[in-house]
Amino acid sequence: MKTRTVLFSIAGTVLAFAALDAAVAFFATRDSLAGPLDLSNVSKIRVEGAASDIAISTASEGPHVAELKGERHGWGAVWHSGWYSDACPAQGSMRIEGDTLTVDVGRAARFFDWSDCTMELTASLRPEAAVIIDQQAARTRLAGDFSVVDIRSDAGDVSLRGHAQAISISGAALRAKVTFERVMQNETIAISGKMLEATLKFLTPTPVSYLVEAVASYVDSALPNTPGAKPEITIRGEMVHTRIE
């Protein structure tokens, strides 16, 4: 009987901790680390650091601003929000030099940190801005008209809807979805990754040229390959799945 009681007590404790852990998973605190900053005179954004969730848009009308936030999830968010004042992480920062906004999202969370921290960048700029991202991991959502989009990320999830004259996306494991709302016949698109899933969609029917180089590839194109035409698409990788429509 004593053995059974002990076993039930242990089982009850495990279930209680499991329930508490599940509840804490829904607990999050959000810290505003920097901004909003005025981007009226900014035409280029550069994002550095470990990892972040990025949303950048362009519009002729303002306000043109940027804000960096950190959102904590998990056990540490419960205690950290009430007892500590330092942000998530404290070294996340933004600075403007000339026409360039540089965003540093800081280091990745350590293995023994009590909470996971998601760095979130939101920005609105004037059309034809340039976006440069160099991170270990990034989820990037772009909407609007851009001059240059240059993204280097070991693990990346990229979506762009609008237009960009030059697109370069590279990394190890990538998923990219690019939707062109208009075409100027001067676009170049280069996407490369070891494991790559890429979808390119043109809302206006247009001739395109494309080159796919991969160890193993599956290319599904609704548009014929027209040598010399632009948009010019180059895709390289080891395992590649590409759709062009």
Please provide the spans of the model-predicted regions.
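Charged, glycine-enriched surface loops/patches
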Residues: 145-147
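Acidic (Asp/Glu) and glycine-rich low-complexity loops/linkers
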Residues: 2-134, 150, 161, 168, ...
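Transmembrane beta-strands of outer-membrane beta-barrel pores
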Residues: 137-139, 155, 173, 216, ...
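Fold-core signature of tandem repeat domains
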Residues: 140-142, 153, 158-160, 176-178, ...
